């Protein structure tokens, strides 16, 4: 049996493990991790689809939300519209955060080849933050993306496990006569490429994936959207709550699916946190050993300014001490 080297138990080893990877490397590698997790999720969706109890035998479970809210078939489409709107708003917010980063490092506003009055001003101007300005603006867009994508990957991975463990009867009308998956490979690719919109899977309950992304956008704008414009918080809050209503009213998920997803998403987003070093060092351990997709050391500052490293040997230090 191989004996671990002594240095693994030393402080220097763990100090190296805690040393943060470059932010650009984290962006690339965690995005790749998210794609891999997406494929794992689709495989889990196929398993739950096959294991779902027969709707003709097992009826949906009693649900207080179903009793309080009138059933409105097809409302899940509006939930998809809410997600689409928040996707666009989050991309816009991330771009504005990038402009704040440029302003922080002293770069000027970007310019379009042709100036369009009003449009250029709206998209390319720097909206100086008036809330949460205690957060360092340097690399704010990169850190926000790392926090978003790592939280999302963690939630999807846990969802892949949880929904396979216990199969629940599906309350959704579309799943009362569930379609059969003919080509599994095609279904996997179609589901990943369309973010689930191009296929129908049943039994993927506990917890709601729609609620996860709605809540992630809510948390993203609650922290970072307020730095761009004060109105983003109330607007996104209203849209997210309406999306929750659409999910329950359409019987797309049980109320518990929505409540558990809200809690787990908020807790995960807070646990990942905002840090100038990017993701927590424990998460960086999963991507630190990669031989590709970015550098493993911060030899150059994130804004592209070279870092000067001064090394003094012992003889030089002794000479300076004597002089």
Curated annotation (Swiss-Prot):
The stretches that face the Extracellular side, renumbered to this chain, are 48-74, 169-187, 255-257
Query: Which GO cellular component terms, listed alphabetically, does the Swiss-Prot or TrEMBL entry include?
Result: endoplasmic reticulum membrane; Golgi membrane; plasma membrane
UniProt key word Glycoprotein: no
Entry keyword annotation includes RNA-binding: no
Which of UniProt's keywords are assigned here? Answer: Kinase, Lipid metabolism, Membrane, Sphingolipid metabolism, Transferase, Transmembrane, Transmembrane helix
What domain of life does the UniProt record list for this protein's source? Eukaryota
- Reactions performed catalytically: an N-acylsphing-4-enine + a 1,2-diacyl-sn-glycero-3-phosphoethanolamine = an N-acylsphing-4-enine 1-phosphoethanolamine + a 1,2-diacyl-sn-glycerol; an N-acylsphinganine + a 1,2-diacyl-sn-glycero-3-phosphoethanolamine = an N-acylsphinganine-1-phosphoethanolamine + a 1,2-diacyl-sn-glycerol
User: Its Gene Ontology molecular function terms?
Assistant: ceramide cholinephosphotransferase activity; kinase activity; sphingomyelin synthase activity
The record's note on what follows loss of this gene reads: Elevated ceramide levels and growth arrest; cells were arrested in division but replication of DNA and organelles continued giving rise to cells containing multiple nuclei, kinetoplasts and flagella.
The family database entries (InterPro entries) matched by this protein are listed as: Sphingomyelin_synth-like, Sphingomyelin_synth-like_dom
Enzyme Commission number, as recorded:
2.7.8.-
The UniProt transmembrane annotation reads 27-47, 75-95, 148-168, 188-208, 234-254, 258-278
Any GO BP: ceramide biosynthetic process
Topology of this chain in the membrane: Multi-pass membrane protein
One Pfam family assigned to this protein is PAP2_C
Cytoplasmic topological segments: 1-26, 96-147, 209-233, 279-323
Localization terms from the record: Membrane
Task: Outline what the protein does.
Answer: Predominantly synthesizes ethanolamine-phosphorylceramide (EPC), with minimal sphingomyelin (SM)/inositol phosphorylceramide (IPC) synthase activity. Specificity is likely to be defined by residues in the lumenal catalytic domain that interact with the polar head groups of the phospholipid donors. EPC is synthesized by both stages of the parasite life cycle, bloodstream forms (BSF) and procyclic forms (PCF), by transferring the phosphoethanolamine from a 1,2-diacyl-sn-glycero-3-phosphoethanolamine to an N-acylsphing-4-enine (ceramide) or an N-acylsphinganine (dihydroceramide).
- Similarity comment: Belongs to the sphingomyelin synthase family.
Q: What is this protein called?
A: Phosphatidylethanolamine:ceramide ethanolaminephosphotransferase
Species of origin reads Trypanosoma brucei brucei
The taxonomy runs: Eukaryota, Discoba, Euglenozoa, Kinetoplastea, Metakinetoplastina
